[in-house]
Amino acid sequence: MLQPQVPVAREGVPFIGFAAFLTLVSAASECEILTFIFLLATAFTLYFFRDPERFVPDDPSALISPADGKIIVIEKTDKQDFIEGEALKISIFMNVFNVHVNRAPIAGKVDKIIYTPGKFYSADSSQGAEYNENCGIVLTTNSGKKIAFVQVAGLIARRIVCWLEPNDTIQSGRRVGLIRFGSRVDLYLPTDTALSVSVGDKVRAGETILGQII
């Protein structure tokens, strides 16, 4: 299932427009150095807020990566507040060069959204995992399983954007938000989820299958 083409995330438009405006003003003033600097800034903001098409696997039981990046944690944990009991946790770290638009990992209905204020430690640190600001989306899949995916702020990424509301029905691969300037997304899954990835694997939001919700 191919998602519609949206070249940049809507949250990026003001940044891109402002950088482009400064480029034009500098060019009109014939200031070559500033024009070059602001042109680079415009190119960077375009690159950072890019939102490319993704080919979403047409498999209702497939768990799809919600973020671009690298898997840094796979573990079982009971230290979480999103789904009952022990959960299988997958953490995906996004660096500043990754696409930062997040996507739904599976189809379902949003039960609740839990925003937790916090710190801004490095997102790939143990402190960041425990104390950083985050926004958790808890949903019930179409097969009746409870899962959660959590947008986590980071040292540079201090702006979490979530486009969902409770009771929203979402399709797998749908754009659901973004985190500005690099951070992480944590998944909390049933412990019987059959994974097909390992720590260190690089993944793409909306395309990479992480496993199957049994």
Swiss-Prot record:
Its cofactor is pyruvate. The modification Pyruvic acid (Ser) is found at S183. Pathway: Phospholipid metabolism; phosphatidylethanolamine biosynthesis; phosphatidylethanolamine from CDP-diacylglycerol: step 2/2. GO terms for molecular function: phosphatidylserine decarboxylase activity. GO terms for cellular component: plasma membrane. Binds 1 pyruvoyl group covalently per subunit. The keyword Hydrolase does not apply. The keyword ATP-binding does not apply. It is a peripheral membrane protein. Is synthesized initially as an inactive proenzyme. Formation of the active enzyme involves a self-maturation process in which the active site pyruvoyl group is generated from an internal serine residue via an autocatalytic post-translational modification. Two non-identical subunits are generated from the proenzyme in this reaction, and the pyruvate is formed at the N-terminus of the alpha chain, which is derived from the carboxyl end of the proenzyme. It is found in: Cell membrane. The active site is at S183 (schiff-base intermediate with substrate). Its EC number is 4.1.1.65. It is an enzyme of class 4 (lyase). InterPro entries: PS_Dcarbxylase, PSD-A. It holds the Pfam family PS_Dcarbxylase. It comes from the Bacteria. The record marks G182, S183 as: Cleavage (non-hydrolytic). Signal peptide: none annotated. Belongs to the phosphatidylserine decarboxylase family. PSD-A subfamily. Heterodimer of a large membrane-associated beta subunit and a small pyruvoyl-containing alpha subunit. This is Phosphatidylserine decarboxylase proenzyme. The gene is psd.
